[in-house]
Amino acid sequence: GIAGMMIDFMDRDDQEMIRIQEEFLAKAAKHHLFVQFHGACKPSGLSRTYPNEFTREGTLNYEHCKWDKDTDADHDIHMPFTRLLAGAADYHLGGFRALPKDKFKIQQSNPYVTSTRCHMLAMYVVLESYLGMICDTPEAYEGQPGFEFLQTVPTTWDKTVVPDASVNEYVAVARRHG
């Protein structure tokens, strides 16, 4: 059997779409399935009633690096203070083809990300997402430093502490699993 599903291309946030999403969650819960909403609006609180909602995109995401350079570390520093307050995010992390913004070039196949590998790895701990993903092809990770971390980093945490943060400037997050 299957454990869950990704539902995509719900690019609106009107009352009817929220009702449709709730119906998806209710039916999936009856069958003990998780749901990942991709290409969906910001969270509306449904995950409080339906904890089978694992993640929801509702963000400017690294998939946009295929056509622009707006998703970068400057964008990411807003996330813990804005979008993540509403719930876990489906966020494409782990791009190992990382370049600084001044060297970045748009490329549809094997795209680059405007970041650093260290930043990409840190975001797996900073951002809350119950469904850890990598956003690149297998060849981008084979034999690369940091890939072992991606294979073992937890997606749930027993304790989270934010020892220091300044809105839209920096955030330090410490998490414990087990």
Regions found by a protein language model. Name each.
Residues G1-Y112, T116:
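Aromatic- and carboxylate-enriched substrate-binding clefts and catalytic-loop regions
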Residues K101-L121, V125-L127, G132, S166, ...:
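Long hydrophobic segments that form regular secondary structure
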